[in-house]
């Protein structure tokens, strides 16, 4: 896991970072921003990502069938600041993803991902907010997702789903994943802005997701074949 970090900066206790970069076999990014050591360690950085192998990078820190390092040690409460991440494009199991943007907020041991957004294939978009917190040694991931597609039929074909659907579809979901038990709990699922899923449907989706996606850990949420199986059992 060889990593090259080059920092060019000016300043003493407050540093201005410029023309810097972080590179390894999974990640390549330009870096600029500010770092301060006055009173406490604080940073405000911009990462302009040129290349990323997200799933491989996640496997480094969240290996399947092992207790993830982050769950053993947590995130230091001394790490506070923000990292704005932008990426023009990346390849994924559903095709090319464009204009990926998000803000990582580190605050007293919690990690929040705010204002996440990306353009997906077939005129589809996703917006997301995430919160990772270690609450009394019970780490969890809160999530809020908003998906919209102007060509739902073509998008679903990526998952070998050929059922008749409306051309335009929206779906919003909020919930929590227990990172110890690898179980998901949905607070709400709403389709096409107003149709809220009833309790029985939500329980069915939770059971399906836990059995087919999270059965080997949180990284199942990035596994195309697991997501494909989940979607097929749910929609076919």
Spans of features found by a protein language model:
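Membrane-proximal interfacial segments on either side of biological membranes
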Residues: 1-236
